[in-house]
């Protein structure tokens, strides 16, 4: 993976897009083994994933540097009443159906502090997309890769202000990403 430029891609994603601040309360949805954690400043990190093995590995690797939960962000964190400055949803949306993604965003919006942000990154279908990128998308295990409009529709009905970015230079191989930054503009 790192031969594809993933290390540089994660650094760039964290520094230029995610932009966490020291002390932020951050939720990492679909965190896997928490590979993003070494790239983050000191903050209050919670990673959640359905895969027990990923969470067990993250706990072994990072110990008390974060809180690692096996579960579903849409359900399990609601009951705790926690709120977050920053919610990262990385390479997850293209693996879930529209109705599940819409429910996820509704739940995440309730977990977001005023002026907090949800940041997503996924692969995307684009018109006139390079052949190699289309091939990589077809080979991806995610069956819900969307167009930019398709990703934006997932946030319809939320009260979030959404900005999108398209990147085609994050990895060393030709690959197109869509980034959505959804901000909770409420002040209370």
Model-assigned labels for residue ranges:
Residues 1-78, 96-103, 107, 119-188:
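Class I (Rossmann-like) S-adenosyl-L-methionine-dependent methyltransferase catalytic domain
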Residues 91-95:
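Short catalytic micro-motifs in class I SAM-dependent methyltransferases
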Residues 88:
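A conserved beta-strand element that flanks and buttresses the S-adenosyl-L-methionine
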Residues 112-118:
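Short glycine-dipeptide loop
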